[in-house]
Amino acid sequence: MQRKLTLSIDAMGGDAAPGVTIDGTAEFLAGRPEAHVLLYGDEARLAPLVAAKPGLAGRVTIVHAAEKITSDMKPSQALRRGKGSSMWAAVEAVKEGQADACVSAGNTGALMAISMLVLRKMEGVHRPAMTALWPTLRGRTVVLDVGANVDADAEQLVTFAIMGEAFARATLGIERPSVGILNIGSEEMKGHDEVREAHELLRNSPLKMDYRGFVEGDDISGGAVDVVVTDGFTGNVALKTGEGVARMLAGRMREAFTASLTSKMGAALAMSGLKRLKDFMDPSNVNGGVLIGLGGVSVKSHGGADARGFARACELAADLALSDYRTEIAANLARVGSGGLAAE
């Protein structure tokens, strides 16, 4: 028997909300018969959109929230003025036990700030981290932090490794995920003090982690490890660079295959392979960043995601809510506590 699941959704967040949000919710619910959704937002706008989709009857509950967090609102402003917003209400539902996880495609900084204030940090977590799933030659790799913290000391990097390992197990289905620290080289003497100290801490820790040492930038897309650990500044630059390269390649391929009649014929012959490549590179298939290390599940969908992309973010939230990844994180943080992080 499947466990019942409830998601709280900020229906007003995102570039094309609430239309895309409702469409994505419908797609998510079509594949999750055990799920129910709480939709937070302007009831007058949401009700007709929900009514137009018969599949949502009895599967969603609209909860009116008069305010909306705008895309240009600073995190500090969101904390001061956002309590009546759809985003705040969706996060609050997780805290109050009304929902198992929340999803928003709204303002990233605001969602992070509200989630940290409302859900609080897990015991032993000094700084939560933002995760991303990265397409690789081997499938998918978890990268964290990708923007929650501009810097991180050695012990925080170790915490990121612990959280990333549990996250990979829950989302990728890997029994013993491999973990590496992003560095400018694989040699032990490379990098700044923080990454070298974190390397020693992980290598000598009591954890049964499959720690592989340092990895380089090209190892991310190569799939050298299942979890890549870094600070938020480096991780965000890497993520945005990867997204830019993917868009550039897609554009160049489109130009190449439409440049002449011969190239168009070649594209027609290679259509099935090109479709597989397009699907692999489509960011909608890996949509959803998670602020990990909190007392509840908060998932950030890309603001420009289409319905399929938003549905993927909801699926990620559901998978995490049904997993015991936070219990694993707490247990491993306890194991390395009380002096267990002292490097030899």
UniProtKB/Swiss-Prot annotation:
- List the record's Gene Ontology CC terms alphabetically: cytoplasm
Q: Which EC numbers characterise this protein's activity in its record?
A: 2.3.1.274
Q: Where in the cell is it found?
A: Cytoplasm
Per UniProt, the keywords (alphabetical) are: Cytoplasm, Lipid biosynthesis, Lipid metabolism, Phospholipid biosynthesis, Phospholipid metabolism, Transferase
- InterPro entries from the UniProt entry: FA_synthesis, Phospholipid_synth_PlsX-like
What are the GO MF terms of this UniProt record?
Answer: phosphate:acyl-[acyl carrier protein] acyltransferase activity
Choose any GO biological process term that the UniProt entry carries and state it.
Answer: phospholipid biosynthetic process
Q: Which reaction does it catalyse?
A: a fatty acyl-[ACP] + phosphate = an acyl phosphate + holo-[ACP]
Functional pathway: Lipid metabolism; phospholipid metabolism
Q: Which family does it belong to?
A: Belongs to the PlsX family.
Summarizing the function annotation, the protein's role is: Catalyzes the reversible formation of acyl-phosphate (acyl-PO(4)) from acyl-[acyl-carrier-protein] (acyl-ACP). This enzyme utilizes acyl-ACP as fatty acyl donor, but not acyl-CoA.
Quaternary structure note = Homodimer. Probably interacts with PlsY.
Q: HAMAP family under this entry?
A: PlsX
Entry protein name: Phosphate acyltransferase
